Amino acid sequence: MLQHEVIMVASECRGLAKVGGLGDVVWDLGQQLARDGVNVAIILPRYGIIEAQDEAAATFNVPFAGRKFSTTLTHVDVHNGPSLYFIKQKLFFEGEDSTVYVNSATRGRGPFEDDARRFAFFS
């Protein structure tokens, strides 16, 4: 029988980085699919706020906005659940951008300007 595989790419996931209902849906759906025998992987940005023992799986350059950004794919072992992967890039997801969503207005920029840049890179 064919093994189904699902990759879920999201900005939030309960237990790691959650602000609203999206984080609940991503985790609960991933857990249920895994229980149903589906091979599930969840991919998130590696925000600085995430406390996980992840290991580097690959490093590569991502072309974005006319530049190349060194980026690392990391992995966390989860027993009996979805595989967890993170896209780690310091400029977009660490330091002052280490939370899920950023209030750009406090930086004198337009609403959601920083999030638009961060998630365009992530996509």
Kindly give the residue locations of the regions a language model identified.
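N-terminal subdomain of nucleotide-sugar transferases
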Residues: 1-80
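A conserved catalytic-core segment of Leloir-type glycosyltransferases
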Residues: 46-123
